[in-house]
Swiss-Prot record:
It comes from Ignicoccus hospitalis (strain KIN4/I / DSM 18386 / JCM 14125). It catalyses: (S)-4-amino-5-oxopentanoate = 5-aminolevulinate. The gene is hemL. Pathway: Porphyrin-containing compound metabolism; protoporphyrin-IX biosynthesis; 5-aminolevulinate from L-glutamyl-tRNA(Glu): step 2/2. It comes from the Archaea. Its EC number is 5.4.3.8. One of its GO terms (cellular component) is cytoplasm. Transmembrane segments: none annotated. Its cofactor is pyridoxal 5'-phosphate. This is Glutamate-1-semialdehyde 2,1-aminomutase. Pfam families: Aminotran_3. GO terms for biological process: protoporphyrinogen IX biosynthetic process. PROSITE patterns: AA_TRANSFER_CLASS_3. The keyword Cytoplasm applies. GO terms for molecular function: glutamate-1-semialdehyde 2,1-aminomutase activity; pyridoxal phosphate binding; transaminase activity.
Length: 423
């Protein structure tokens, strides 16, 4: 018995399903356990080296164990790792975010993307004094009650339409419409405008594969929000700092009222950010009536890692390397995978996905028609050949500054070999 299997047998008695996040159980026949990581490489407890295209599901845009991040974390640990008071690094990281996102005047640091979207929605409701929100079918905004309705991601992989334990009274306040369908958004928004607090959207869907917005779609959301008095919330937990320093809102030229960030902004440590216009943000406690608090908010180690990461991103080379790697692998998927099995490949900057067996994917319903079995087989065959991609087409491939030419060439060889044995 290998060590990963041995550990999983123990874990099944300790954790529901043997894991602490559902997607980790999707690796078959059982999850592998990681001992260490560096650059673009994971090393399992059994000594197997894997090129990593999951990167912690997005945060590690510099790759694993980047020396600048490691140095910053070590320096902070030597000064203490939890104060329960304000500290200088939270100011420095906030200043960076405000400088990169013109829509953001102020921020509140929290501890996860889930906390960020939960706080943003509560804030929108408190500010507008309205209750309903519009979300998009297949957009994932974390694991809290308001957004566990047609939520994509691991929910999709395991075939669960929502979640048990969410009261119907709560889910009724969440109105779900198809992504990229302006007409549907406008209809639902205007029918509910007297009680519509917010429209929340992943500007690029990243938890139903990778689905970009159609030309003008996000600008139409801005218009509809303005006309109905709702706040527009961009959930940039994935796209923030991945599509560029200014995220999706800079790329597509649309200014939201509130933005949520996470993943990259913590440099690989737990983090969430809510940011927006001053007059909205000041509704948060202690300056306003909308409650938010947290023992670990603006954790010093996270702030150090995030600041080091963003300092490195400002140098520019990270985006050049990561985007180039993504372009090459996505092109290979188009030339080899699509040629054999059909489908489409979507890439936005350094995130991409192949949807086998479908002609177009503009929304979650389209994504559900893709051949999940072929996608899972590719995951399995690449894993045998030393490449780790997410075990679900409802996730994305991610690249980093560590995915240089040698890493990409090894990936392309493994991809060609894997596709030959899939039928």
């Amino acid at each position: 018995m290998d060590r990963s299997l041995e550990l999983f047998q123990i874990a099944k008695n300790l954790f529901p399903g043997g894991v602490n996040s559902p997607i980790r159980a999707a690796v078959k026949p059982y999850p592998f356990y990681v001992k260490k990581a560096s650059g673009a490489t994971l090393v399992t407890v059994d000594g197997v080296e894997l090129i990593d295209y999951v990167l912690g599901y997005g945060p590690l845009i510099l790759g694993h164990m980047h020396p600048k991040v490691l140095e910053a974390v070590e320096e902070q640990l030597n000064r203490g790792w939890l104060y329960g008071t304000p500290h200088e690094l939270e100011i420095e990281l906030a200043k960076k975010i405000v400088s990169h996102y013109p829509s953001i005047d102020m921020v509140r640091f929290v501890n996860s993307g889930t906390e960020a979207t939960m706080t943003a929605i509560r804030l929108a409701r408190g500010f507008t004094k309205k209750n309903k929100i519009i979300k998009f079918d297949g957009c994932y905004h974390g694991a809290h009650d308001s957004v566990l309705v047609k939520a994509g991601s691991a929910v999709s992989h395991f075939g669960v339409p929502g979640s048990a334990g969410v009261p119907e009274e709560v889910s009724k306040l969440t109105l779900v419409v198809p992504f990229n369908d302006v007409e549907a958004v406008e209809k639902v928004a205007k029918e509910n405008q007297d009680d519509l607090a917010a429209i929340i959207v992943e500007p690029v869907m990243g938890n139903a594969g990778v689905i970009p917005p159609k030309e003008g779609f996000l600008k139409e959301l801005r218009r509809i929000a303005d006309e109905t008095g709702a706040l527009l919330i961009f959930d940039e937990v994935i796209t923030g700092y991945r599509l560029g320093l200014g995220g999706a809102q800079a790329k597509f030229g649309v200014v939201p009222d509130l933005t949520t960030l996470g993943k990259i902004v913590g440099g690989g440590f737990p983090v969430g950010v809510v940011g927006g216009k001053r007059e909205i943000m000041e509704y948060l406690t202690p300056s306003g009536p909308v409650f938010n608090a947290g023992t670990f908010n603006a954790h010093p180690v996270t702030m150090a890692a995030g600041l080091a990461t963003i300092n490195e991103l400002e140098r520019g080379y990270v985006y050049e390397v990561a985007n180039s790697a993504a372009e090459k692998v996505a092109k290979a998927l188009e030339q080899e995978a699509v040629a054999k099995f059909g489908g489409v490949v979507h890439r936005v900057a350094s995130m991409f996905q192949w949807f086998p067996g479908v002609e177009e994917v503009n929304n979650y319903a389209d994504a559900l028609k893709a051949n999940k079995e072929i996608s899972l087989r590719l995951h399995e065959e690449l894993l045998k050949r030393g490449v780790f991609i997410a075990p679900s087409l409802f996730e994305a491939w991610f690249t980093s500054a560590a995915h240089g030419e040698d890493v990409v060439n090894k990936t392309l060889e493994a991809l060609s070999e894997a596709l030959k044995v899939i039928s």
